[in-house]
Amino acid sequence: MTEHGLRRYMKSTAVRKLTVPVLQILLDKVAEFTAHVGPDSYFSVCLYEYFAFAKIRSRNEEATAFNNRGDWVGISLIPSWTKPEYDGFARDWVHSTVDALADAERKDDPTEEGVVGKRGYGNGSDGLEKVTQVFGANYPRLRKIKKKYDPELLFRKWFPIVPAED
């Protein structure tokens, strides 16, 4: 799935169900990407991840650091290309695709009734977005713990929690 010189950008999101509107968005967006980039997009991937969430949902959101307690279908978008001139387009394409999926979910259920936690996925998010989506409402509590046990930020990789201020 890789070769020398291949450029990639990855971002993940999640939906509650793979509905026809969601699949149509993905089909249209992939067609848009391949039409723009052409044959150079042949290693692009759209992954659907299904996990059993019953055990995860058996604990409430505040019981652990991670806030995601919902039933989700993970979607990882990994466009590929080789020409640097497509870098900006690819990044914008990924973000607009994630936004379109979120919009479709809101149209399907504007109240998001029954949604527990966030749909963020730490391995495919950027910076502070990653931290706040992964920890959600637990982030302020984790900042206090960080202040007490690691104020010097010795452990600052992966999900860098900023210690609470005085």
Model features per residue range: what roles?
Residues 1-166:
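Soluble FAD-dependent oxygen oxidases
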